[in-house]
A protein has these predicted regions:
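C-terminal motif of bacterial Sec signal peptides marking the signal peptidase cleavage site
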Residues: 16-18
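Terminal, contiguous helix-loop blocks that mediate binding/assembly
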Residues: 54-95, 210-211, 215-251, 256-744, ...
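Structural recognition of the beta-strand scaffold that forms the well-ordered cores
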Residues: 101-106, 136-141, 200-204, 247-251, ...
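N-terminal extension/subdomain marker
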Residues: 59-196
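Catalytic-core segments of thiol-dependent peptidases
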Residues: 141-243, 253-254, 259, 276-277
Length: 754
């Protein structure tokens, strides 16, 4: 069944001439792991998994026959300690010494059908590597409506072996859903039966969305994806046919370097490879991987992992996208020690959160931790937050204990770009902005601690002085088990409150000693009272303009707000500067992240480029220098992160997009990008503008102040007019601004300069 590879190599040569990616640099080598405590009861435990996926949330309804799980987590109410039980096998090699087989679950999706050819390029890299009888890639194809090569067939699930610079079609089966556990299980059962070796790896190749939405979007089956629970079920079913673990399981996709993922894989593999941040379309360097194994057939997962991470970083750097790069190699033999320590830590943090006076401050601390995959209005939310960042940020409220030591101990190696210098190596779900009840249901089934579930529930549900109880997650005896959460031990409707949340800019938790006003020095300012300080987590400002007397256009967000979190006093620090295209066309800009030292701020701007909606990413250095990263499509409706950050090209037509008062969109004037163009940061044009404070509360709602009018004159001076009241209620940040009812004569004549 061998096919000629001449044509496919020609296609490969074409796609390899392109380069696409998404990220940054910094070599951050993890410390050696310490010896783990004996927390594992090596007995097989197989139970039913999480509920079937609902098509309203995932795009398809999937049933997985004979669902299984290879581990159990439990906490006793008597001591609150986490106990772990994992399935085990004989630990006996399944093939000849010095032979490596890497199984690749190649779900092409739009990374192929859009003409990008990313999967095709990676298979080309496998073919270009040094030949050896001791290294082979075994591939299953699917998930895309079109391949960028003439070898793979769209209407079939095909299985190929790449070895010694050749590719052979060895099996072709009925096309099935790559987002279904049964498809993965079938491939792996067939694979380990026919291509077992001393060391075996598994790579998930496609889009990823983090712990909640999982990996591998099958665009032929309603964009269904593999949840972590389904990966667990598939791996458990094949594990019973194996006498040894996979040497590694890795994700050549975005955002899967998470604690929830590592917990699932610990039963089945020795190492996990995953990125906390988004990955570029070019992904891993399979030539480097294969060449290393050809020369080092006895290498273990840690040694290979370092090569994977370093060569991945180099791939990103070649395309000038190394800044966002992250890749972590986790020693899963040490991971259970981390789980035990994390549960202890989560218990302490949960106790601290029950003090309503401290909860707002804790959430404010977590807000400052690094997060990954957008997490803003323009790009969407993944709710993936750095574990080390959470622990360090909350150190004043909960003793870290040994959790950071255990975390470092299980990180064999990681490679971080300059935008993620402090990333600890693993993320965890945290409800920065909940997208609905299904998100919380999925999380409860994969969570690694009942106390951490309780914290997430407390934040998502808006706990205040009315009291909070986490009894719903425990039995009458005070015990907890992940089996109970997976099997809907508690009411399946419990999280429905997340579908009823409405955020309208009138948070009752944000209260003032002095409400926003313009003071005698021309500063727009306010002072929170004690209650407001307890619940406020961040303060920013929104800038808007009246486009044509009828259209109220929001320019975006600025973090230029001065404040004191001890006294509750805040005042504007807006200097009148804004970002624009080279011809002066203003961009709508929103803050993605900024460094604590003020040396770097990352922004995103919604735009249309060549007719396609996307986001323009750029960062600003401490001296005001602007660096364009490129365009990124953000998080799609399936919760998957786009893999590419595309560089702007000469001739690209850019149209800025702005949000209006009702959250609809308004397009500005188009601009044709020329090579050598740069964004500008200069005074806003002479005219009238509007300024409003945004104060976020601990639960995702916010308070928006009345807009005040400020003018910029021909000299660039900022003038606030009136007493700070436009006569617009805070509701109108996302409502009807009532221009017809507005009378400019209502303002006092006094003007303020600064």
């Amino acid at each position: 069944m061998k096919k000629s590879i001449i044509c496919i190599l020609l296609i490969f040569a074409l796609v390899l001439s392109g380069c696409s990616s998404s990220d940054d640099e910094k070599d951050n080598t993890g410390t050696p792991a310490t010896e783990s405590v004996d927390t594992v009861d090596n007995e097989t435990k197989q139970e039913t998994n999480t509920p079937v996926k609902d098509d309203t949330d995932t795009g398809a309804q999937t049933t997985v026959a004979d669902k299984k799980t290879g581990f159990s987590l439990s906490v006793s109410g008597s001591d609150k300690k986490l106990k772990i039980s994992r399935a085990a096998n004989a630990g006996k090699s399944m093939g000849d010494d010095g032979v490596w087989t890497i199984f690749v679950y190649l779900c092409g999706t739009d990374l192929e059908s859009s003409g990008q050819g990313s999967a095709t390029s990676d298979v080309a890299q496998m073919l270009e590597s040094e030949g050896s009888d001791n290294v082979r890639f075994v591939i299953q194809t699917g998930g895309t409506s079109e391949w960028e090569n003439e070898m793979f067939t769209v209407g079939k699930a095909e299985r190929y072996v790449v070895q010694n610079g050749d590719i052979n079609l060895v099996d072709s089966v009925e096309l099935t859903n790559m987002g279904d556990a049964e498809t993965l299980a079938s491939f792996l059962k067939w694979g380990v039966s026919n291509y077992a070796s001393e060391k075996m790896g598994l790579v998930f190749w496609d889009h990823g969305g983090g712990s909640i939405t999982g990996v591998c979007v099958d665009e032929l089956f309603n964009c269904d994806t593999l949840y972590l629970s389904e990966i667990n079920s598939a791996l458990s079913s094949v594990f019973s046919d194996m006498t040894d673990k996979f040497e590694f399981i890795g994700f050549d996709c975005c955002l899967m370097g998470t604690a929830e993922t590592a917990n699932v894989l610990t039963t089945y593999a020795r190492y996990m490879y995953g990125s906390q941040e988004t990955e570029p379309g070019s992904g891993w360097n399979y030539t480097a991987i294969s060449d290393y194994l050809v020369s080092n057939p006895s290498a273990n997962g840690a040694e290979l992992g370092k090569v994977v991470a370093d060569s991945f970083y180099d791939e990103c750097k070649e395309c000038e996208q190394e800044n966002e790069c992250t890749l972590t190699i986790v020693d899963l033999s040490k991971f259970d020690e981390f789980l035990v320590e994390f549960n202890d830590y989560a218990s302490r943090l949960y106790e601290a959160c029950q003090n309503s006076d401290a909860l707002g401050a804790i959430v404010r601390c977590i807000d400052k931790a690094e997060n990954f995959g957008g997490n803003n209005k323009s790009e969407g939310y993944t709710n993936m937050v750095d574990i080390g960042g959470i622990v360090n940020a909350c150190a004043d409220y909960a003793d870290p204990g040994n959790v950071l030591t255990a975390l470092k101990g299980c990180i064999s190696y990681n490679k971080n770009g300059s935008n993620h210098k402090k990333a600890s190596g693993l993320s965890i779900y945290y409800p920065l902005q909940v997208q609905g009840s299904n998100e919380l249901k999925v999380f409860s089934g994969i969570a690694i601690s009942p106390y951490y579930i309780s914290i997430a529930d407390m934040v998502a549900n808006g706990y205040t002085d009315n009291g909070y109880s986490n009894e719903v997650f425990f039995t009458d005896d005070g015990d907890w088990s992940n089996d109970d959460c997976e099997n809907d031990y508690f009411d399946d409707d419990y999280f429905d409150y997340a579908d009823e949340e409405e955020y309208g800019g009138e948070s009752s938790l944000i209260t003032f000693e002095e409400e926003p006003y313009v003071d005698e020095n021309g500063m727009y300012c306010f002072k929170l009272d004690e209650n407001g300080l307890d619940w406020a987590v961040s303060v920013s400002a929104e800038i808007a303009l009246d486009y044509d007397g009828e259209t109220f256009v929001i320019l975006g967000e600025t973090a230029d707000v001065n404040g004191d979190w001890e006294t509750g006093e805040f005042y504007d620090n807006f200097d009148g500067y804004w970002y624009s295209l080279p011809d002066g066309t203003l961009l709508s800009a929103y803050v993605v992240d900024y460094s604590e030292d003020g040396e770097r701020a990352i922004y995103t701007s919604p735009v249309v480029v060549n007719g396609e909606s996307t986001n323009l990413r750029f960062w600003v250095g401490g001296s005001g220098d602007i660096h364009i990263e490129g365009t990124w499509d953000g998080i799609d409706e399936n919760g998957m992160a786009a893999r590419e950050i595309k560089k702007l090209q000469d001739g690209d037509v850019i149209v800025p997009v702005y949000y209006l008062e009702d959250d609809s969109e308004f397009e500005g004037s188009e601009y044709e990008w020329e090579e050598g163009d740069e964004l500008t940061y200069s005074y806003l044009p002479e005219g009238d503008y509007y300024y409003s404070f945004y104060v976020d509360d601990a639960y995702g709602d916010y308070y928006s102040s009345d807009y005040v009018v400020f003018s910029i004159d021909e000299n660039g001076e900022i003038i606030f007019s009136g007493d700070g009241s436009m006569g617009l209620d805070g509701d109108y940040a996302y409502g009807d601004y009532g221009y017809d009812d507005y009378d400019y004569d209502d303002y006092d004549d006094e003007e303020y300069y600064y």
